[in-house]
């Protein structure tokens, strides 16, 4: 019975991995999808997506430049606030 439980668990894990891989989007298609999403609304100007830098202090007290951007900082996987210290 224990062997059967292990076999079922392995089958479930393998099925989950296969589903995850099949639902992944290749990198070049992902960029095209993002461009379609960003430029799909003609009424929204591109400038409204770009937020200017604003000042923020880091732990040492020196000012840091932060802005909202997409994939502009290392290890960033989407859009968010990026601060370069």
UniProtKB/Swiss-Prot annotation:
Q: Look up the signal peptide feature and give its range.
A: 1-24
Q: Which cysteines are joined by disulfide bonds?
A: 66-83, 69-72, 70-79, 73-82
Reported tissue expression: Expressed in all tissues tested, with highest levels of expression in kidney and lowest levels in liver. Intra-peritoneal injection of lipopolysaccharide results in increased expression in heart, spleen and stomach, but not in kidney or liver.
Query: Is Lipid biosynthesis among this UniProt entry's keywords?
Result: no
A single GO molecular function term of this UniProt record: hormone activity
Entry annotated with the keyword Cell inner membrane: no
Tell me, how does this one assemble?
Monomer.
User: What is the role of the protein in this entry?
Assistant: Seems to act as a signaling molecule involved in the maintenance of iron homeostasis. Seems to be required in conjunction with HFE to regulate both intestinal iron absorption and iron storage in macrophages. Has very strong antibacterial activity against the marine Gram-negative bacteria V.alginolyticus (MIC=24 uM), V.fluvialis, V.harveyis (MIC=12 uM) and V.parahaemolyticus (MIC=6 uM). Has antibacterial activity against the Gram-negative bacteria A.hydrophila (MIC=6 uM), E.coli (MIC=24 uM), and E.coli BL21(DE3)plysS (MIC=6 uM), and the Gram-positive bacteria B.cereus (MIC=24 uM), B.subtilis (MIC=6 uM), C.glutamicum (MIC=3 uM), M.luteus (MIC=3 uM), M.lysodeikticus, S.aureus (MIC=6 uM) and S.epidermis (MIC=12 uM).
Provide the protein name.
Hepcidin
Tell me the classification of the organism that encodes this protein: Eukaryota, Metazoa, Chordata, Craniata, Vertebrata
